[in-house]
Amino acid sequence: MSKITQNSNKLSKSAQNRVIYFLTILCSILFLFIGNKIANNEKTMVAESGNSTFHRSIVTEITGQEEVEYTFNEGSKGKSIFFKAKITDGDLKDTVVNSVQNYDPFTPVKLKEISVGDKILIYEDETNGEKEWVFGEYIRSDALIWLCLIFFVLLLIFGKGKGFNTILSLVFTCLAVFLMFIPAILSGQNIYFWTAITCFFIVASTLLIIYKADKMTLASALGCASGILVAYVITFIVDNVIHLTGLVDEQSTFLLFLREDNPLDLKAIVFSGIIIGAIGAIMDVSISISSALYEVKEKLKNPSFKDILKSGLNIGRDIMGTMSNTLILAYIGSSLSMVLLLAAYNTSILYLFNREMIVTEILQALVGSFALLSAIPATSLICAVIYTENGRKFITSKFKKREVDITEKKDDNVEQSWDINDIKTRINNKD
């Protein structure tokens, strides 16, 4: 009879997990849809003009080439390569057009000349009243798509069900950034608010889709929240101390002119970049610690609060070194070209390390590392409370004690009011 009861409990738990799983997916889709509608309110996007509409095409024939002399710079010669291309998309699909690829001598790196079979983007340009099709770019996105597909296949092979859930969570994460977060920024809405909303959605959807709705997921979510909160606080404090303007590069200047009536808050954009850049590492640390401590709880059967907390801190010490390196190296790698350029043309090391662009990159790495460090003890403490019986008793006893104190205060007030009434009655009787 007990085995039947256990089996029915397992079935009910698995059924609950499936219901929560599908509800999470449904709520995520609904959340993205509503969030996109709100974020796109009054959004001003840079629309493509007719002259810059790109078409996918394939080079079918090279028809010739000629040298071009530049009169404003004597001795400078360029080259124009003429070719035929077959358009493969849109209303002009299967149309063969005459196109040109222009080279100028001012390009520092020699570009690849087109050849038959190349997949390229072309656009129609109008010069001196004459229209011609011009080479725009090589199509590079196809290779990226294939690389992503290979990555997804490997996830499915090695991860199986977890691999599929990982792909699903990645899709939701990307959609949250591109359908909610970026449109909200471009529409001039509060960047701090949308950063918090995006972080909440990414953490909740990722943990509930990849993992079950259990104590481990709860501990991970609370650990992530603590790390993100620390990142918020440190960024706000440091922002006022080091006098950031948000003008870290040329792209930042261009952002100011997107909305002249209501310019984008560049400092807030730097802030959101720091938080969103660190959230992945924070989630990684939180789930690693909560998962490992859950296994410890299962093996020890009845571990103490101290055992879980100590184990969590030990695991965290092993994780924090590599994860901090991961964050710092990721930021250095993403801006390596600019760092090399600034290092080459700035003779003063003091000036170099006070440039806002360098300071912002260092700040991103440091704030992310602080968030990781705070997530380790926070997740360990939360796991110790949730996973252990004495931890739960400690929390419930605190709540019960508070309830008792509130009740006693109420009783004291009632007794005090009765005493006052009694005194008034006695005074009236004497009179």
Task: Tell me the role of every PLM-derived stretch.
Residues Y232-V367:
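Generic detector of multi-pass transmembrane helix bundles and their immediately adjacent loops
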Residues P105-D142:
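Extended, hydrophilic extramembrane loops/domains of integral membrane proteins
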Residues D318, A330-D431:
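Hydrophobic alpha-helical transmembrane segments of membrane transport and translocation systems
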Residues C27, F31, V177, I202, ...:
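Alpha-helical transmembrane segments of multipass membrane proteins
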Residues A15-F22, K215-I228, T322-T326:
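Alpha-helical transmembrane segments and their helix-start/interface "positive-inside/aromatic belt" motifs
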Residues L149-L256, L264-G277:
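Transmembrane alpha-helical segments that form the functional core of multipass membrane systems
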